[in-house]
Amino acid sequence: MTQTLPTPRGSLTPNRTLADLTWLRVGGPADWLFQPADEADLAAFLAALDPAIPVFPMGVGSNLIVRDGGIRGVVIRLGRGFNAIACEGGTVTAGAAALDAHVARRAAEAGLDLTFLRTIPGSIGGAVRMNAGCYGTYVADHLVSVRAVARDGSLHEIAAADLRFGYRHSDLPEGWVVIEARFRAEPGDPAELAARMEEQLARRDASQPTKDRSAGSTFRNPAGYSSTGRADDSHELKAWTLIDAAGLRGHRLGGAQMSEKHPNFLLNAGGATAAELEALGELVRRKVRETSGHELKWEVIRVGRP
């Protein structure tokens, strides 16, 4: 990338490999990696950046495959200036870089129930963008509003209703960067909330490959059977049962593998490339389609050049 970019107060690194910033440890470099110092730095940089240059907001890489050819343009990764957590009254305000688990714990200490966030990997910005959820509770159930910086550097406050949440979906425009989210939370006893989170962690560890290198659930549950908080919240059919029925539990392609413990988890079992991970995922989709007629949709975000 040869364009001249604005000079920020934060860090701007050319040709920065991204593999070490993703949970799967795969992927090529970003043309540029921008880590803004604070909100004003982010807004000024985007306002001055050539509109033709693409931007990709990246969280902690917990639900992401960066392809081996890397990402064009500027990857934006928020850090310390965006991880504050404040609890006041019945609300919790969290910076987009705050980890979901940290927000859940801080809220519980303040006697506020956001326990559903405890077992969700990743940070608040990504959780808002994809309406993350666990055990039948979703970001959409608690979100009041978000603050975000648009691609042109303008600052916006968006009510939760305007994000039009669906299953693993929000209408947040491409290139907009969430910087803060405000949640409503019911009161609860801190000790009881802490105990509930410990139970959730034990339940997760018993059923998911939490010690392996994965990006969480690979595929969405089939439409009409997925938990959305609406009438179709039936939980009668899960992606993992379709993968298992297709005989793909533990299936391997190069260094990529579908987990033996939970077949909807795609693993880097050792030395995998992004191409191998994506190819195994597509093989799973094809086999499930052939054996069940269901079309699995990726939940893991795949981005970049092959």
Curated annotation (Swiss-Prot):
Record has Flavoprotein as a keyword: yes
InterPro entries reported in the protein's UniProt record: FAD-bd_PCMH (IPR016166), FAD-bd_PCMH-like_sf (IPR036318), FAD-bd_PCMH_sub1 (IPR016167), FAD-bd_PCMH_sub2 (IPR016169), MurB (IPR003170), MurB_C (IPR011601), MurB_C_sf (IPR036635), Oxid_FAD_bind_N (IPR006094)
Pathway: Cell wall biogenesis; peptidoglycan biosynthesis
Pfam families associated with the record: FAD_binding_4, MurB_C
Chain residue ranges for the region called Disordered: 199-232
GO CC annotation terms, alphabetical: cytosol
Keywords per UniProt: Cell cycle, Cell division, Cell shape, Cell wall biogenesis/degradation, Cytoplasm, FAD, Flavoprotein, NADP, Oxidoreductase, Peptidoglycan synthesis
Gene Ontology process terms (BP): cell division; cell wall organization; peptidoglycan biosynthetic process; regulation of cell shape
Cell location: Cytoplasm
Domain of life the protein comes from: Bacteria
Active site: 168, 217 (proton donor), 299
Documented EC number(s): 1.3.1.98
Name of the top EC class for this enzyme: oxidoreductase
Swiss-Prot/TrEMBL cofactor(s): FAD
Primary location recorded for the protein, binned into one broad class: cytoplasm
Keyword NADP: yes
Family under the similarity heading: Belongs to the MurB family.
Function according to Swiss-Prot or TrEMBL: Cell wall formation.
Annotated protein name in UniProt: UDP-N-acetylenolpyruvoylglucosamine reductase
Organism: Paracoccus denitrificans (strain Pd 1222)
Gene: murB
